[in-house]
Swiss-Prot record:
Keywords: ATP-binding, Chaperone, Cytoplasm, Isomerase, Nucleotide-binding. One of its GO terms (cellular component) is cytoplasm. Pfam families: Cpn60_TCP1 (PF00118). ATP binds at T29, I30, G31, P32, D86, G87, T88, T89, T90, G413, N476, A477, A478, D492. This is Chaperonin GroEL. GO terms for biological process: protein refolding. The gene is groEL. InterPro entries: Chaperonin_Cpn60_CS, Cpn60/GroEL, Cpn60/GroEL/TCP-1, GroEL-like_apical_dom_sf, GROEL-like_equatorial_sf, TCP-1-like_intermed_sf. Its EC number is 5.6.1.7.
Length: 540
């Protein structure tokens, strides 16, 4: 494919147009009085949202050079979302401000490499200053405040706070769509996995089609159980205890399944068989998790164990097990707490080591099931369009809350950037490095300026007053009042604020040091070529 090239100022200006188009679409959403953006969807109703990363991902420009500029800012939003889960609009506003200011200086003759050094130096000092003014999140109310500010909805903040209180900071909180109008919180305690009973005849409640087992024994194996004789000696001992048994195996089939069902129907004993969760190595790990949680031993060839030789002390126990057609939940397992804590530490170490997002997600799910449980926020709304928009806001709020618990909080509404302004301004430097520091200083004003402008106010006036205000005091654009932002509950997670600044600076520095841009020249399609022939006579 042929290529087209642009150099120096021509290249940077072309890309800047793309940066501005994307950033201008995103930045109208920032702040309590930010607007929504409507996104066209090919097969469904339009999506109305104020989520920065969602808007950024949708933008594809026709001009290849403009599109490359837009893609750079998309990268800022994506990276910030990936690390902190929120703050994508702030990152976009910061990136645009740095690129615009930097380009003015490059056009005036500044050396881009010197500017980059200045930007890096300023950001390093800014991040140190952010951590100095950061405060830990200690209680339920502070967690609720973070969620409420991110989602612009107090009710959402309350749900997230309750969910984190019930399943812990490491717990899994999922967001699902509800079929009703109301949003509600549902907490699944204990370990749940997506495998249900192997026969509907195993249920204990035929109305609800659920098998509820009180104080069950739990047999865990990675083997396939085909012969009833293999488990008969163990079942005879379980019958004498007059307690139910949950069998978790690779599969239960043949006369083993038939006899379990027949004995269940005759009332001889209560047994429920479910397939083991996961596949391959993940299955082994999940079975081991369940064994540690319930105090069982996995019957496996790896340990040289046979089902015929299994004894009662190899079985796990729990306070309760609930099995539906699709899920099995084991509540309050009787495993040794020290063993559970050691397993939790092991999984946390694996999370730190892995680079795979998929593996990290699966490890976090396993961690949550061992550490506390799973909370589900079921999102309700009056229409599909509202449902999608509300779900996106809750996802952002949840990510913000987790970030706040991890690294603490700072004053919100762009105030934190102005609180660190003076420290960055005091950095001693000369020449292009000093100019690079000034680029960051100008960018630190941008979020506050944009929030004020979205509220219909003059941003410059708010910025100048903030430069002289005490740390933590800021402008509440929702009420047009000057308040202590932390006391008023207007806060941002430190991690979100830090990530947005770091990623914006990184992309801006790359942009300013760009000297050539190479774009593909689209190939003329066959249809266009044939149309150009004008239907020549004699053609067959």
């Amino acid at each position: 494919m042929a290529k087209d090239l642009k150099f120096s100022e021509d290249a940077r200006q072309s890309m800047l147009r793309g940066v501005d188009k994307l950033a201008n679409a995103v930045k109208v959403t920032i702040g309590p009085k930010g607007r929504n953006v409507v996104l066209d969807k090919e097969y469904t109703s339009p999506l109305i949202t104020n989520d920065g990363v969602t808007i950024a991902k949708e933008i594809e420009l026709e001009d290849p050079y403009e599109n490359m500029g837009a893609k750079l800012v998309q990268e800022v939003a994506n990276k910030t979302n990936e690390i902190a889960g929120d703050g994508t609009t702030t990152a976009t506003v910061l990136a645009q401000a740095m690129i615009q200011e930097g380009l003015k200086n490059v056009t005036s003759g500044a050396n881009p490499v010197g500017l980059r050094q200045g930007i890096d130096k300023a950001v390093e000092v800014a991040i140190e200053a952010l951590h100095e003014i950061s405060q830990n999140v200690d209680n339920k109310n502070e967690i609720a405040q973070v969620g409420s500010i991110s989602a612009a909805d107090e009710e959402i903040g309350k749900y997230i706070s309750e969910a984190m209180e019930k399943v812990g900071n490491d717990g899994v909180i999922t967001i699902e769509e509800s079929s009703g109008f109301n949003t509600e919180l549902e907490v699944v305690e204990g370990m749940q996995f997506d495998r249900g009973y192997q026969s509907p005849y195993m249920v204990t409640d035929s109305d609800k089609m659920v098998a509820d087992l009180e104080r069950p024994y739990i047999l865990i194996t990675d083997k396939k159980i085909s012969s009833f004789q293999d488990i008969l000696p163990l079942l005879e001992q379980v019958v004498q205890s007059n307690r139910p048994i949950l069998i978790v195996a690779d599969d239960v089939e043949g006369d083993a399944l038939t006899n379990i069902v027949l004995n269940r129907m005759r009332g001889t004993f209560t047994a429920v068989a479910v397939k083991a969760p996961g596949f391959g190595d993940r299955r082994k790990a999940m079975l081991e998790d369940l064994a540690i949680l319930t105090g069982a031993q996995v019957i496996t060839d790896d340990l040289g164990l046979e089902l015929k030789e299994a004894t009662m002390d190899m079985l796990g126990t729990a306070n309760k097990a609930e099995i539906t057609k699709d899920n099995t939940t084991v509540v309050d397992g009787d495993g040794d707490q020290n063993s559970i804590d050691a397993r939790v530490s092991q999984i946390k170490a694996q999370i730190e080591e892995t680079d795979s997002e998929f593996d990290k997600e699966k490890l976090q799910e396993r961690l949550a099931k061992l550490a506390g449980g799973v909370a589900v926020i079921k999102v309700g709304a009056a229409s599909e369009t509202e449902l999608k928009e509300r779900k996106l806001r809750i996802e952002d709020a949840l990510n913000s809350t987790r970030a706040a618990v991890e690294e603490g909080i700072v004053a919100g509404g762009g105030t934190a950037f102005m609180n660190i302004y003076e420290k960055v301004a005091k950095i001693e430097a000369e020449g292009d490095i000093a100019t690079g520091i000034n680029i960051v200083l100008k960018a630190l004003e941008a979020p506050v300026r944009q929030i004020a402008e979205n509220a219909g106010l003059e941003g410059s006036i708010i910025v100048e007053r903030l430069k002289n205000a005490d740390i933590g005091v800021g402008f509440n654009a929702a009420t047009n009042e000057w308040v202590n932002m932390l006391e008023a509950g207007i806060v941002d997670p430190t991690k979100v604020t830090r990530s947005s600044l770091q990623h914006a600076a990184s992309v801006a520095a790359m942009f300013l040091t760009t000297e050539a841009v190479v774009a593909n020249i689209p190939e003329e399609s066959n249809n266009d070529a044939q149309a150009g022939m004008g239907g020549m006579p004699g053609m067959m």
